[in-house]
Amino acid sequence: MPTGRAAIFKGPGIPFEIREFPLPNVEPDAILVRVTMANICGSDLHLWRGEMQPPAPIHPSGYVTGHEMVGRVAALGQNITTDSLGRPLKEGDRVVYTYFFPCGRCYACLDGLPNACPTRFTRFGPRRSDVPPYFIGAFGEYYYLRPGHYVFLVPDELSDEIVAPVNCALSQVMYGLELAGLRAGDTVVLQGAGGLGLNAAAVAREMGAALVIAIDQLPQRLELARQFGADEVISLQEYPTPEARVER
């Protein structure tokens, strides 16, 4: 029986366990992906440090965490012939997919707010490693896309390094700026130039913002913000109060 390895999370501060699991049987409308690259998101660190609550109580068997990833199709369900945009899909193709799984039928989804779907995390299946499909996070050799999960082909010109974080930081800021109604010629102020802020600077610039301002206390982040598209940067060390920053 074919198997794959995964890192099992059992709780904050507990070392991950590398374990081997049988590959799940692929349902007719599901996809099994061989993960080629996974990133460590800031939320992964917060979870391991105990600084944030997991989406559900941690089962004694633990589960696979991580959500920033890219991979290649290892097995297609018999009913799957295309990605979510209707493009032909076959084994070996490189794909990326959302890390949440909205139902598409609730009030939030129908109102264009899939991020507020109450079942966007529970639809992955049981968060435990003692029952299939086992591979429900990025920190495993495989990832199981359940029936109905969004999946998209990756252009050859984009590297795994670029694509792996797309379904987290990049998609979050794109959605956030669209939700905020950013239009060409607007001014955007970014409160923080971490991973999300840097992506937001680049996206705001691409969306036509006339002025992008980044605020942070770390000089190296402010320098990166300029490289990512910020026109002006404001240091919290130099301007510590809101009044001083507004005057600046």
Residues of each region from the PLM?
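Glycine-rich beta-strand-centered segment in the early N-terminal region that forms part
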Residues: 24-38, 52-110, 155-157
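Cytochrome P450 core scaffold surrounding the K-helix E-X-X-R motif
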Residues: 43-49
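Nucleotide donor/acceptor-binding cores
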Residues: 4, 93, 185-186, 210
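Surface-exposed amphipathic alpha-helices with a cationic face
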Residues: 178, 201-206
